[in-house]
Amino acid sequence: PVAADEVEEALNAKLEDKLNCTVDINYIALSDYTQKYSLLLASGENIDIIYTSTWAFYNEEATKGAFAEITDELLQKYMPQTAAGEDSMAFEQAKINGKCYMIPKNSPYVNNAMPVLIRGDLREKYGIDKIDSVEKLEEYFTAVAENEEGIYPYAAAGDAVEMSMNLFQSRNNLVPMSCGSGKYFGYFYQGKDPAAEDVVWQYGTDEYLEYCKLMKSWADKGFWSKNAVSNTTSPLDAFQNGTSAALFWNLDTCESAKNVVDSEHPEWKAELVNVTPGVVHVKGVYTGDGFAIPAVSENQERALMVLDVLKFDKECYDICRYGIEGSTFNATSDTTYTLGDEQANYAVSWGLKNDVLERIQGEAGTTQSEIRQELMGDAISEVTSGFIFDDSSVKSELAAMNEVCSQYVPLLELGLVDDVEGTLAELNSKCETAGAEKLKEEFISQFTAYLEGLEK
């Protein structure tokens, strides 16, 4: 972020006063983390605090011994505010074989709170009413594809996982379940917690086949580039620079992108829309964002003290989450804020999010946005959020399957194949060869034991 140095300087002024220490913050680009994250930890570089997540190798790195254990004693001694103020379920969800290696955010992720950010000016230009279904979104995409030059309806890139989370998982009430970095298992929510026999192999479901067929039809209509898999410009950047008419992402990211666009291009009339109304919104894990202490850190206790302050001290929290008051944000009350003129120069930090101290954008008295209430206000808790799969006995099978899926899944989910059914059958066949059956047996065994443990 452009304002990163200024934010770090302001934060260090507070930390020197409160803890007699400073931090030196380094960033890994989102486009590079899959290649660089594990290499950085393996290098032995003396890092004291590092972002981690269920989607950013938490399970894999923790089981390799890359992270220090976070015990209850350490929390009580060095993170008393966190120990007292954070939901204990967050630390339960972070446990692997009974041990915790993460300080999760104090804000549960809602698995399917997935809006779409669109260009309101283009919607109005082509006379399209409120977009509140996948069919209406397709109408909007078709109008853009047929009439606009230099703008894709959706500038997909890489694996387009954000789109599949919305239009496959959320649309079908499919709750994904933790299995390393793969998207292999889940269950269809039907008003009750699942039994072990309700767990499905996602790539073998009729719903996944229908999703891939829909993506094939959209790709054939030119909704994204034929080279989308190798596209290195993120959909977020594409929307903000005007080469994409939509953005699929989680609610926080879409709201942040809307803020940037509203500031830089108000004439685009950016709109957040919900194309899957009526689906069940399920609270997922706290471990969707958090921080770990690398095992090589020489300052582990001090690192925990710093995290405690960043998460629960109001002054430090505002700096970390919103930047510089009067520049990147303006506090309008103790609980609200408006965007500053330099807001685009600083991005909010995910891993520290704490619902106790979060501000709502707007003037004093502002309440949550309608779209946020719609997507998150009725979220329910369910049993699988605390289940973390231990992949230590199937690492080779998972590695082989990840390799297979990296070749097939992006093409299927972007519709860039000639024969959807044939390609999907080939994917499943190669996964079987790679060890899918062994993986499923181990997964079901662990999930069964997890359910039995909840009954004791």
State where each predicted segment sits.
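Extracytoplasmic/secretory soluble proteins
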Residues: 1-456
